[in-house]
Amino acid sequence: MAKTIAAIATPHGVGGIGVVRLSGDRAVEIAQAVFRAADGSRLSDLPGYTARFGSVAQGDKAFDQAVALVFRAPRSYTGEDVVELSVHGGLVTVERTLQAVLAAGAAPAGPGEFTKRAFLHGKMDLTEAESVADLISASGQAAADSAYTALSGGLRQKIEGALDILMEVSAGMAAWVDYPDEEIPELDSNTLLESLQQAQDLLSHLLAGYDNGQLMTAGVDTVIVGRPNVGKSALMNDLTGQETSIVTAVQGTTRDVVERTVRLGDLTLRLADTAGLRQTDDVVEQIGVERAQARLQQARLVLAVFDGSTPLTPADEELMTLCKGKTAVAVVNKNDLPPAAVQEKIRAAFDRVVAYSAKNHTGRDDLAVAVADALGVQNFDAADPLLANERQRQCCQTAADCVAEAVAALEGGMTYDAVNVSIDAAADALLSLTGARATQAVVDRIFEKFCVGK
């Protein structure tokens, strides 16, 4: 019998309520040892999906009011008996409730152990389990919606669609090879190729959406660059909504890289405000300039900032050169001041140019549109199932490669046995993706990344 586990399921700190979750064969028994229902009823007598108001106690001493929620196996999150004790939020009370249930016989839950048990009891596959962590950590609406699509089985259904095609092709060829004396209709190579192409198209679609999905869910490594005093730090502060970077009229104020994460439209940008690009004799500032140039080369997205109220300088011209071949948006700042004749030259160097005023807080919406367009995610659909991480991508890529090998073998006139080797390998990769054939080491590695209590 698996041990009954318990953990705090809500964030640590002061809040309206705090929840201690128990799961396992003894969950109700252990919760009953610390919970006193106000109506005198016993948790062990309650059916699933039942709540009782009462108090929690250590020994004979009650220390808080509480609500107990009882879920019976298999109709619970984990597939086991589950009890959730909701007490008033606060470090002391919630921790005391956890200590009481541990003293009554529960074992501390490990990271992700509740969701791991849900997976092991068939309540969800690995793609759905991984989406739980993605939903919790989502930093934007698109990321949350995408995670919910996976949690609702969207990705699993896509994978199962490809698997069904592969299994049907494999079964047909295996029957033809294994039972040559039976009256099995002769297989048509063109029909087999069409089926394999359908599976290949499904996998290719998932792989094609991976990079954009990562941009929407994991965020975009973004650097703000420009010569001194064009308003880089002011732009950073305007986007973050707080004085993250120091803004002064003194050139060289920003000397190191300042980093923050912000929402821009549906995207999450991991912003880095850098030192102004210029020649300087100041050793410390020069280090900052070199770091800015390095970040520009590494970043997925460049926000190149120019002062729209002054003529272009050699430093501006150099920035235009540095941005060639990069995914970049030109931000012409200080739109609140009389404009200088710089727009035409900037537009010749950049596909996307946004007029901005960090002082008056205008241009943010236009910047969001330009950034989404530059990254190719302007038509991102969170309802379209996505591969959520590198593990899933590798499994899908392996399956796609094996299907391609099967197609080549079939077109090359190889035996059905030989073709089936590649098809079976593709199926194994997809079954590993969903967890049906994942190794214990892979499963453990996935769930150890979860927070305790989930």
Predicted features along the sequence, with ranges:
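Generic enzyme active-site microenvironment
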Residues: 271, 305, 331
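Short, Asp-centered acidic motifs that coordinate Mg2+ and/or phosphate
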Residues: 269, 301, 329
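Short glycine-/small-residue-rich Rossmann-like dinucleotide-binding loops
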Residues: 240, 275-276, 300, 307, ...
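A glycine-rich (often HGG/GG-containing) alpha/beta subdomain
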Residues: 1-145, 149, 153, 329
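C-terminal-of-GTPase-core extension/linker across diverse P-loop GTPases
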Residues: 2-12, 141-263, 280, 311-454
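Switch I (G2) and immediately adjacent beta-strands of P-loop GTPase domains
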Residues: 52-63, 68-72, 252-280, 298
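Inter-motif core of Ras-like GTPase G domains
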Residues: 285-309
